[in-house]
Curated annotation (Swiss-Prot):
Tissues in which the protein is found: Expressed in spermatocytes and chordotonal organs in sensory neurons of the antenna.
Effect of deleting the gene: Flies are viable and develop until late pupal stages. Display defects in wing posture and inflation, in locomotion and climbing activities and have a reduced lifespan. Males produce immotile sperm and show defects in sperm individualization process within cysts. Display defects of polyglycylation incorporation in sperm axonemal microtubules.
Native source species: Drosophila melanogaster (Fruit fly)
Gene Ontology annotations for the cellular component aspect, listed alphabetically: axonemal microtubule; catalytic step 2 spliceosome; centriole; ciliary basal body; cilium; motile cilium; nucleolus; nucleus
Protein's name in the database: Cilia- and flagella-associated protein 20
Length: 199
């Protein structure tokens, strides 16, 4: 999808305020909903994904299962609200051994498990809005001893609210971020930054 585009700085794949936030995504809903609502904390439109079973309600990008993202930027950043319910997301990457690896982070797991094609890890979310920063290059190296080449697919499951999902070439401080990539809270409460842990 983005393989032949010049990639530097920021590359956004979901913005809840955009005219078509799920333009690049496919959605699956069973016993739940995916809809745009106004979040009271930030007084802004967000995408809400809610389901009784995290595995059956999710959004996935790209929408076409035969296509891949082809994003080479190594940092995945998601601005997500903790709904105090089970939540998981998954990223599929390609490494320099030409092997597809999946990283799955969830808030209901307590240990990291590394298997040949999937690494599952715990994720701790603070209350309210969180900025999840995922260093794909570092995770690929630590889990598999190989080098990250590109991201193929991103899948976000229930239960959460999403403001934005983007990739970046490095981690940026709050001051360096373009205004539309920041999360402005009406009462200026700083957004918690959390990292998924893969040990």
């Amino acid at each position: 999808m983005f393989k032949n585009t010049f990639q530097s700085g920021f590359l956004s794949i979901l913005y809840s305020i955009g005219s078509k936030p799920l333009q690049l995504w496919d959605k699956k809903v069973r016993n739940g909903h995916i809809k745009r609502i106004t979040d009271n904390d930030i007084q802004s439109l967000v995408l809400e994904i809610v389901g009784t079973n995290v595995s059956t309600t999710f959004i996935t990008c790209p929408a076409d299962p035969k296509k891949t993202l082809g994003i080479k930027l190594p940092f995945l950043v998601m601005i997500i609200k903790n709904m105090k319910k089970y939540f998981t997301f998954e990223v599929q990457v390609l490494d320099d051994k030409n092997v597809r690896r999946r990283f799955r982070a969830s808030n209901y797991q307590s240990t990291t498990r590394v298997k040949p094609f999937i690494c599952t890890m715990p994720m701790r979310l603070d209350e309210g809005w969180n900025q999840i920063q995922f260093n794909l290059s570092d995770f690929t190296r630590r889990a598999y001893g190989t080098n990250y080449v590109e991201t193929l697919r991103v899948q976000i499951h229930a239960n959460c609210r999403i403001r934005r999902v983007y990739f970046s070439d490095r981690l940026y401080s709050e001051d360096e971020l373009p205004p539309e990539f920041k999360l402005f809270l009406p009462i200026q409460k700083p957004v918690q930054k959390s990292n998924a842990i893969c040990s």
